[in-house]
Structure formats: structure tokens, C-alpha cells
Amino acid sequence: MTERSIFDAAGGAAGMTRIADAWHQRVRADPVVSHAFHKGTKPDHIDRLAAYLGEALGGPPRFTQQYGEHADVVRIHSGNGEHDEMNERAVDCFRGALRDAGITDPDTYQAVLDYWTWATWHPMYQFHGSPDDAPAELPMPHWNWDSTVSH
């Protein structure tokens, strides 16, 4: 029997969209994290984030089929210098977004939060010196219930 994915436990594509929308609303209102969005976002930012999050949590490969590669996302988040406070606040916003999106099962909540925290502090922050430091190809990480990544 196949174990249920985190993606499915969090509500599938609709759940990912609720999470992405709630996070987007929270970070746009946060006085520190909103700085990352001061130049605006793509009109489909919420859908892109939902697709990316879904793929990383065991859903279909919608992000890589429609929008780009993991390396593209890492480069977008690279070269911004050290910003520990922004990362901490972004994770706090995500905690609230999970609640706003109705993720009430404790195991699902924790699994999604653990992924987001790992992604915030590792691949999205790893190349804070320059986006040119990010490799051209990086496999999409796939998070599981054991809080480990496979590619």
C-alpha cells in the first residue's frame, strides 16, 4: 500500500492554493518580509507557489512542467545578502498561513511547516551572496513524512 502524500493530506491542489494565498497575504502585510515583494510579483505568483509547494510535497510535477526548474526558483531567491530576520518572519507567516488555510491535522501541519522551514533556510538561502553561485541545474526536492529530502 502506498503511503498518502503530504500533498494529499494537505488538501491536494486546492489545499496548496489556499496555503499559497494565505502566505502571500501574510507576507505582503509583514513590515519586514514585504520588502521582498516591493517590486511586485508575477500575476500568477500564487499559482506558481502552489504548484511548487505541491510538487515538493508529493503532488504532480506541475511546477516543473509549466513554470520552470527548481534552480530557477533558487536563483530568484539568491543574491539578497544575509537576512536571518526576514527568514524567521517568513516562517512565522507560514505558520499562520497554514492555520488560515485550514491545515488542522497536527502531523500534516508539522510536515508542511518542516518542509517550508528547511526550504527557507537551505536551498532558498544557500546562495545569498550571488545568484551566479547557484548551479544551473538543481533537482526538485521531494519532502516526505520523515522530514527528509529525495530528488
Show the residue positions of the predicted features.
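Surface/interface-facing alpha-helical segments and adjacent flexible terminal/loop regions used
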Residues: I6-A9, I103, A136-P139
